Amino acid sequence: MLKFICYPKCTTCQRAKKWLDDNRIEYELRDIKLDNPTLEELTEWCNKSGLPIKKFFNTSGLLYKSLDLKNKLPGMSEDEMLKLLATDGMLVKRPLLIGDNFVLVGFKEVEWYEFVR
């Protein structure tokens, strides 16, 4: 079953959830604020997605901005970035849709459709 990792108050996550429901796609919902991704999960998802770790950061989030990560990330190692992401789910870009063979970061309807149909 697909894992849908989101922050329920996020409007993009709400749109993604509605899209999943409208298309009758079964998923397991996980609130990223209540159940923060672990270092092991983040490492697996980064590897499975093929995306650079920086793509997993919620660059529009208040926490990202308050920590000045725009300026700090370039000097960090991949391990340091993953460990930082594992400290707070609000640093992680959302929603995440995770299947057996894929990890989608952010909601792009066309991309999601290609992977779940």
Per-region residue spans from a language model:
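Local sequence-structure signature of Cys/Sec-based thiol-disulfide redox active-site neighborhoods
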Residues: 1-23, 27-32
